[in-house]
Structure formats: structure tokens, C-alpha cells
């Protein structure tokens, strides 16, 4: 049996949507690092997270949490069982979160765990805007 190798989390991206394309490619729509709202509580209709795991082999449990600014309240949590057969290949774990409610402006956190150990924390700034802006 092959030796178990703990994978590295090479990136975490936040976006509006993810699509699987022909040939195994993925398309990311609306990559962002901030959420803007004119009032609170605010509901973000669709938040997709993309995690890429690489250089690992074996089976692992991953957990993704969206946390409040004080990191005490879990807004969302997803768990996935990773099965990595060969350290040369990458695995992309995609989670879609619908209607995420942000109760107040502030710095929220996306945390990723591998077998119960915190691997990374990604900041998500939720900002109050006075009027709707267009880019």
C-alpha cells in the first residue's frame, strides 16, 4: 500500500459561481474578496468557494467554515472526504453556499481544516456602502 502523504492547500478562491466545462476545466465567475451591502443584515445570494489540494496521497477529511467576525459563530460549514490516489495530481473541492446572511459589516473568515487541523484562514471583508455603486 502506498504511503499516505498529507496534501497542501495551494489556494482558496471566493466567487459567485463555478461551472464544470468539457475536458475537466472549471470556469470561475465573479471572483471577489469583499462583499458590499447597503443595509444589514445582508443576504449574499450565492457564494462559491474553490479549494485546490495538491501533492497528497490517501484519504482525508476536509472542513470549510464561514465564521462571524469574532470567529465564535459558524455561518456555514461543509465537510468533504478527499481521496487522493497520486501525489502528482490536484483535487479541486468546490462548495456552493446559497443565501449567506451577514448580520453586520466586518471581517468574516473562511477557515479550512484537514483532518481537524486548521490549514488556512481567508479574510472576507463585508462592507457597508451608502449607495449602490456600479463598476
Give the residues covered by each predicted segment.
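Contiguous segments within soluble domain cores/interaction surfaces
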Residues: 2-135
